[in-house]
Amino acid sequence: MYSPIDAPGTHPAFHRYHLLQLFRDVKESACRCAMIAPTPAVPLDSSKWDVELPDHSLLDVAWERMHVPEVLFEPSLLRSSLPPCLQPGGGADAAAIAAGAAELQGMVPDGYMALPDLVAETIRSCDTDVRRELWGSIIVSGGCSLTPGLTERLHGRLNELVPQISMKVKIIAPQTPQERRFAVWIGGSILASLGSFQQLWMSKQEYDEHGASAIHKKCP
């Protein structure tokens, strides 16, 4: 990548922030979600794909562009699938390969769920009376939801998980990228501006005095 050698005195946090921005730009410009789960017979596409960096150098993300989104549907890939640079013959020494594999092993805690399974489990944990409505009003938001193919893949997998054929899966996605990226914040700001919601607010003093039980009194 690049280093802050051209900006002496810059705080490391500033460099990290822009590095994350660069990763986000690469993710949003290159990543694609496979429409179906990969198999040995039909693996993920790893054809060459270059992204131009701020210093005009080219970064080959042929492997990452399809594997990164796939982790949302198959978290075990973080444990089992090393990028080419950390595979034997990829340019890294044995110590780097072992360190990379060990780090990946620790990235996925036990019980880490795939996105479709997480949605389905969340709905199952709700009252039976509202499950049908929840299956029909699944909202996707955030930057990762903009990955091409993700909404379609999620919809297809949820159709396999829905408990009754009479329940219809419907995914709702804000139309513009900015609306989808900040949908959670926009929704929260609208909710906070409602007079009826302000009656449910709790001050720190109330919480310190009554504890968590005060929440149930205000939001029965």
PLM regions with names:
Residues 1-220:
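C-terminal region/appendage detector
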